[in-house]
């Protein structure tokens, strides 16, 4: 199966052992094949030469993917890391973004080479029980991400209305605005991608404005960015580092990106076209994640400058002397270090730099919440279709996800206070980190299979780097669990944690086992797991084509 052309049952070699037959026309995708049922044609240019026209044609999926790097959970993680550690964790943000890019590169390659997304490949290769458990974990990650978007949007509405819209009211508004944004589907793929680009621009301008007015110390900022150290750090700083990793590298985003790249018309019978598509998607993802990194850097630097080592009393005094003195009581009058969240963050910016800073912060937060809503909807639909072969309309899919997200959020908003809502945001960031192995292990497994990826399978360097990412994430998660268990409020919780830990370790062990098979540990392959070495049997391929 090497070379540009060759005989096969379909008249031409198709890369990826589970590839589907060619689509009937250059503009028409198979039903459900892309997120808008259409494909973007790629212009013909001089072979081997870089083309801005081609880069523009491939631009879109990477920026949609980058939205997950900018959701309200990321904003909360950024500002808390700045408030807790100053500039000391900027290097964690930088390298988490680089590691995220490496994972997204693998996701894009899988989609381009095989013509199927990660959920579809999992459906074909994993047995039923692990497959269902894996699907449930990714759905949990999607609901958790959606809860963060609901929280961020509700707080943005509260800030923009000067408190006239209560938090529970903001939560309910998110139901309406979500369905409004679904109407964007009717305006075509490129217009939808342009709208997401507009929201990213809003975030860059609003959070960039906060960076300019805060004027962080540039020397200390550069030192924190490029010197990986954390002098004097303890458990609070470590938990913030875990939160950064969980917020930046989100499990469902890997599944999302592997499906988004299918929206471009790539001739998978030609290895040159596949190689070219991989290159352009990598360039686009690098540009998109560079923008997202700068936006996250703006937020962390602003709060590292304005909030680091601030006490509640100091924050109270700052607001009491400002034009926003009515907000001062949200800060307790004590000398404890202030525990900032996305609501208090907007308030203190307004107290320090004027009301405009507060409203600009709220607009950026609103853009983060709204953009993440749409990408979360697409991720949920792709995951459900891929794992279960169950096709729902986006309306039904968003109704399910948003209902699961809103119920606990609105209960907290009604019966508890803002601090509990922000605390939930922090917990959800850690949840994303805990669930990350259920995306990284499958993508590493399948992109390392020569039977599936052929000449585009991971090389030794890629395997080592991605495996190192996985070991790092698992080590950090293990440390978090060991640190968290002693703080459980009641002994009865220990049995629940033990049950969840057993299920978690069982599924992780299975995924590691199959991953090791593809990395060269052939002695681990038995019976049906031979497919991880040699691809699917011919009859399984045919079933995959008819059901996929």
Curated annotation (Swiss-Prot):
Catalytic activity as recorded in UniProt: Zn(2+)(in) + H(+)(out) = Zn(2+)(out) + H(+)(in); Fe(2+)(in) + H(+)(out) = Fe(2+)(out) + H(+)(in); Mn(2+)(in) + H(+)(out) = Mn(2+)(out) + H(+)(in)
Entry's Gene Ontology cellular component terms: late endosome membrane; lysosomal membrane; phagocytic vesicle membrane; plasma membrane
Subcellular location: Late endosome membrane; Lysosome membrane
Domain of life: Eukaryota
Encoding gene per record: SLC11A1
Glycosylation sites: 335
Pfam families in the record: Nramp
Organism the protein comes from: Bubalus bubalis
Statement: the UniProt record of this protein carries the keyword Iron: yes
Annotated TM spans: 56-73, 83-102, 140-160, 165-184, 194-214, 238-256, 285-304, 347-366, 398-415, 427-447, 464-485, 494-513
Annotated protein name in UniProt: Natural resistance-associated macrophage protein 1
Keywords annotated in UniProt: Endosome, Glycoprotein, Ion transport, Iron, Iron transport, Lysosome, Membrane, Transmembrane, Transmembrane helix, Transport
Membrane topology qualifier: Multi-pass membrane protein
Entries under InterPro entries matching the protein: NRAMP_fam (IPR001046)
Side Extracellular, residues: 74-82, 161-164, 215-237, 305-346, 416-426, 486-493
GO biological process entries: iron ion transport; manganese ion transport
């Amino acid at each position: 199966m090497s070379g540009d052309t060759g005989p096969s049952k379909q008249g031409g070699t198709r890369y990826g052992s589970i590839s589907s037959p060619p689509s009937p026309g250059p503009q028409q995708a198979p039903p459900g094949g892309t997120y808008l049922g259409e494909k973007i044609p790629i212009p013909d240019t001089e072979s081997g030469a870089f083309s801005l026209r081609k880069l523009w044609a491939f631009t879109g999926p990477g920026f949609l993917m980058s939205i997950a790097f900018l959701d309200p959970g990321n904003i909360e993680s950024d500002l808390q890391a700045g408030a807790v550690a100053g500039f000391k964790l900027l290097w964690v943000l930088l390298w988490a973004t680089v590691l995220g890019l490496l994972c997204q590169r693998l996701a894009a390659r899988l989609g381009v080479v095989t013509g199927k997304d990660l959920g579809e490949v999992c459906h074909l290769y994993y047995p039923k029980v692990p497959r269902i458990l894996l699907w449930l974990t990714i759905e949990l990650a999607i609901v958790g991400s959606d809860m963060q978007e609901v929280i961020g949007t509700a707080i943005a509405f509260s800030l923009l209305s000067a408190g006239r819209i209560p938090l529970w009211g903001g939560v309910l508004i998110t139901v309406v605005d979500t369905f409004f944004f679904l109407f964007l589907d009717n305006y075509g793929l490129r217009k939808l991608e342009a709208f997401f680009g507009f929201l990213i621009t809003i975030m860059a301008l609003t959070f960039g404005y906060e960076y300019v007015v805060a004027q962080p110390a540039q020397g200390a900022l550069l030192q924190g960015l490029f010197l990986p150290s954390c002098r004097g750090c303890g458990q609070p700083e470590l938990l913030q580092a875990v939160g950064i990793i969980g917020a930046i590298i989100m499990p469902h985003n890997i599944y999302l990106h592997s499906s988004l790249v299918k929206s471009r018309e790539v001739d998978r019978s030609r290895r040159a076209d596949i190689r070219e598509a991989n290159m352009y998607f990598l360039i686009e993802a690098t540009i998109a994640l560079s923008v997202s990194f700068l936006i996250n850097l703006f937020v962390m630097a602003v709060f590292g400058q304005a909030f680091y080592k601030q006490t509640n009393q100091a924050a109270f005094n700052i607001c009491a002397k400002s034009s926003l003195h009515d907000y001062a009581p949200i800060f307790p009058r004590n000398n404890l270090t202030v525990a900032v969240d996305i609501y208090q963050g907007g308030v203190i910016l307004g107290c320090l730099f004027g009301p405009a800073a507060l409203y600009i912060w709220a607009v950026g937060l609103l853009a983060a919440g709204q953009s993440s809503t749409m990408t979360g909807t697409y991720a949920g639909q792709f995951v459900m279709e891929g794992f279960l072969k169950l096709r729902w309309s986006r309306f039904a899919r968003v109704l399910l996800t948003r209902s699961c997200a809103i119920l606990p959020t609105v209960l907290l908003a009604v019966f508890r206070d803002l601090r509990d809502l922000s605390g939930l945001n922090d917990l959800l960031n850690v949840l994303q980190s805990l669930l990350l192995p259920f995306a990284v292990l499958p993508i590493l497994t399948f992109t390392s299979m020569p039977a599936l990826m052929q000449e585009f399978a991971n090389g030794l360097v890629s395997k080592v780097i991605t495996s190192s990412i996985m070991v790092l994430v698992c080590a950090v998660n293990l440390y978090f669990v060991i640190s968290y268990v002693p703080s459980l409020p009641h002994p009865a919780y220990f049995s629940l944690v033990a049950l969840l830990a057993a299920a978690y370790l069982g599924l992780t062990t299975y995924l590691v086992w199959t991953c090791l098979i593809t990395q060269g540990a052939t002695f681990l392959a038995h019976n049906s797991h031979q497919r991880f070495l040699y691809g699917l049997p011919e009859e399984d391929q045919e079933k995959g084509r008819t059901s996929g």
